[in-house]
Regions:
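Bacterial N-terminal signal peptides
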Residues: 6-17
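Formylglycine-dependent sulfatase
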Residues: 2-3, 20-411, 415, 424-458
Length: 458
């Protein structure tokens, strides 16, 4: 009798475990801000410590040829949210060229665009697919419109900062207020310019608070965790880990910001493991664009000191790979074999179809991307060569295309062509030697985009 009871109990737990594994996976997408391709140990960094993110890489899949949506924040995140490339998505720059919503950046009046009610987001997609959706941290797609927050664009919960609520970011990394589900909340530790509660620590705590409410629910969830680090200004809560380094102060601060980011990721991962969520959760880690070097000599010196973009050419705001190629690591114990490296080109527009596949969604949507979910399951060549597209307006109208190993950058009407397999640093223009490839790219560019009222082509 005792033996039968033992077998029955064992069988019950096996059924329970199989049932849990058969549920649609949860999704967590962690986004760093201005983290360079070469800023992580798993991508070649020698000076900055990133043990937790490196461990994600060892235990998951590391993408070598993954790209953000644009070389700056807002359009890149717009591509991520809508699944449309920067020639189709609503927001194509941090500030508009024409029209938009007025607001203040310091004493200057600037104009921004926002995601509209017509924009179908990954939040909308997963909401309609039965997921609970949440976001913590940076949004940057409201464009001074208080009715264009994440909770108006497909997210059940949002806590973070918004450009339409200046009080939530006016004190940089030490915000005195936080926007939480339609209301602002005072952060007492940061009032009167105090520095008691670091922004990314707040974001991590908010993410864990959300996760704590998901353990006893049958609904799967999407959680977007959008950190500020290591975006300027240089400001870290603790620099003790590099105290003994013979480095200039700015270098210690930047390295400490990335170390803080790494510790935040480690804290989230450990929470998933400790609370039984890791077995059915897929975690993505990425950056919104390349490392920043422009703006001040201070930022240039930091980027060069750490070689933040590795062997890539350019930085944030460049259409060369240093501006748009980013780290991408996916961690999912039991789904992804550890230590895998994938060189298939992909970009932010792929995230929406990938999430749709993970969710087994039947919801209709439009995307310029292709699901990379099959790559996570070990099918190395499952995604066929296709065109990846970017456009940018801050330096005049520029376009970029990736097709297989070919990378094209079009400036002032002239196309430069690089063979990334032989020339990852985009140092040798081989357009003259490859007229057939140029013709193919020119043909693609004829239909790669639609006009935008906010970013007209002069």
């Amino acid at each position: 009798m005792l033996k039968k009871l033992t077998l029955l109990i064992a069988g019950f737990f096996v059924v329970l475990q199989v049932s849990a594994q058969s549920q649609t996976p949860n999704i967590i997408f962690i986004l760093a801000d201005d983290l360079g391709y070469g800023d992580l140990g798993s991508y070649g960094q020698k000076l900055i410590l990133t043990p937790n993110i490196d461990q994600l890489s060892k235990e998951g899949m590391t993408f070598t040829d993954f790209y953000a949506g644009a070389p700056v924040c807002s359009p890149s995140r717009s591509v991520l949210m809508t699944g449309l490339n920067s020639g189709h998505t609503t927001i194509r720059g941090n500030m508009t060229k024409k029209g938009g919503n007025p607001g203040k950046k310091g004493v200057q009046t600037i104009y921004r665009a926002n995601l509209s009610e017509k924009d179908f987001t990954i939040g909308n997609l997963l909401q309609q697919s039965g997921y609970t959706t949440a976001m913590a941290g940076k949004w940057h797609l409201d464009g001074y419109d208080t009715l264009a927050t994440p909770i108006h664009r497909g997210f059940d919960q949002f806590s973070g900062w918004l450009v339409s609520y200046p009080e939530t970011y006016s004190n940089g990394y030490w915000p005195a207020q936080r926007y939480i589900n339609g209301k602002t909340k005072i952060i007492q530790k940061n009032t009167d310019s105090k520095k008691g509660y670091y922004a990314d620590q707040i974001t991590t705590d908010e993410a864990i608070d959300f996760l704590s409410g998901q353990q006893n629910t049958k609904k799967p969830f999407l959680l977007m965790v959008n950190y500020n680090n290591p975006h300027s200004p240089l400001d870290a809560p603790d620099e003790s880990v590099y105290a003994n380094k013979d480095w200039p102060k700015d270098m210690k601060t930047y390295a400490s910001m990335i170390y803080n980011l790494d510790q935040s990721v480690g804290k989230l991962k450990q929470y998933l493991i400790d609370n039984g969520l890791s077995k059915n959760t897929i975690v993505f880690f990425c950056s919104d664009n390349g490392a920043r070097s422009e703006g001040t000599k201070q930022l240039t010196a930091v980027a060069e000191f750490f070689n933040s973009n590795g062997d890539l050419k350019g930085y944030k705001r460049d259409m060369y790979d240093g501006g748009i190629r980013v780290p991408m690591i996916v961690w999912a114990p039991g789904i992804i074999e550890p230590g895998k490296v994938n060189s298939t080109p992909g970009y932010f527009a792929d995230i929406m179809p990938t999430f749709a596949d993970i969710a087994k969604s039947k919801v209709k949507y439009t995307s310029d991307g292709t699901s990379i979910y099959s790559l996570l399951n070990g099918k190395q060549n499952a995604v066929k060569p296709r065109f990846l597209y970017w456009e940018f307006f801050e330096n005049g109208f520029e376009q970029a295309v990736r097709y297989g190993d070919w990378k094209a950058v079009k400036k002032a009407g002239k196309i430069e062509l690089y063979d990334l397999k032989k020339d990852i640093g985009e140092t040798k223009d081989v357009s003259i030697q490859n007229p057939d490839i140029i013709k193919k790219i020119e043909t693609y560019l004829l239909t790669s985009r639609v006009e935008s009222p906010f970013w007209p082509v002069d």
